[in-house]
Amino acid sequence: MSKEELVKKLTEVGINGEWINPDKYGFSRTFQFELNGQIIKIEWFCNYSTLMIGNAHFWFDRISTYSGYPMQGEWIEFSFGNEKPLHLKVKESDKE
C-alpha cells in the first residue's frame, strides 16, 4: 500500500492526520492522528505497516473501511495476512 493509499483509506472514514518526524530530506514514515482523544501512529512501509496505540503495536497490510464488526458505530479494520483483524471505532452510531 502506498502512502497515498493509506491516507485515502483513513480519510474515507474521517480520519485526518499528518506525517511527522521527517528525515533531513523531508521524508516521513510516521503518520499520526487523534481518535477519541487518543494519539495513534502508523509507521508506514509498502509491504506492511505498524499501527501503534500506546505500547500496543499491530502489523497490517490491508485496511477496510467497511468493517463487519457487529457493534454500532462506524469502524475501520486493519488486517495482516490471514490473522484476525483489529477494529477501531471512528464514529458513534446516530442511534447511540
For each feature predicted by the language model, list its residue ranges.
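Negatively charged, low-complexity tracts enriched in Asp/Glu with abundant Ser/Thr
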Residues: 1-30
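Acidic, low-complexity, intrinsically disordered interaction modules
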Residues: 20-85
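Short acidic DE-rich linear segments
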Residues: 92-96
